[in-house]
Design a protein with these regions (language model features):
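Basic, amphipathic N-terminal segments
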Residues: 52, 61, 65-172
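Active-site activation/catalytic loop segments of kinase-like enzymes and analogous catalytic loops
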Residues: 1-32, 36-56
Length: 172
């Protein structure tokens, strides 16, 4: 119920879930009372997974932010040394994941011509996997939207379950 509705549990989905299950096997009274608790646990796990993904992406975005900052500062103060910063980044083998690439592209695109060089390097690295910067930026945007919807649905569902009259639920 949690994965199919992306964390959204409402009266209709909850009663449909219970009714569908009971077409196979009738639930005992204790099992009916436990359903809201089990769904709460599943929603909390859904929030944990989304939170862990968001935290991991934040680490990648921070890493990109730091590299972009170094490159922008170097391009402004000592443009000839920019290639050394790019080489340092390349040696650090940054993760070519959507959060890192999207943040680096966001910070560097449209800056100076010199700052197009690290983006060209990333584009080359991504092309080895059949990807582009644009694809990863789009993927990152979609993932952020998915996480936002999942978090919102899960929190709303927890509120719904907190307000649920369990006696009425079990008797229905």
């Amino acid at each position: 119920i949690i994965s199919h509705g992306d964390g959204r549990v409402d009266p209709e989905s909850l009663s449909g879930f219970v009714a569908a299950y009971q077409t196979v096997t009738a639930l005992k009274l204790g099992e009916l009372w436990a359903i809201p608790i089990m769904i709460r646990l599943a929603l909390i796990e859904n929030l944990r997974r989304a939170g862990a993904r968001i935290a991991s992406d934040r680490v990648d975005r921070n890493r990109a932010h730091e590299w972009a900052g170094q490159m922008m500062e170097t391009a402004e103060k000592d443009p000839k040394s920019l290639i050394l910063v790019i080489a340092d980044m390349a040696r650090s083998n940054p993760p070519m994941v959507s959060a890192f690439v999207a943040e680096l592209a966001r910070r560097l695109q449209g800056q100076s011509a010199a700052l197009a060089l690290p983006l060209t390097w990333i584009e080359q690295r991504l092309s080895e996997s059949g990807l582009t910067i644009e694809q990863l930026v789009q993927s990152e945007t979609q993932q952020q939207a998915i996480d936002q919807v999942s978090m919102s649905n899960s929190i709303g569902s927890l509120r719904f379950l907190a307000a649920l009259d369990r006696r009425e639920f079990v008797e229905a």
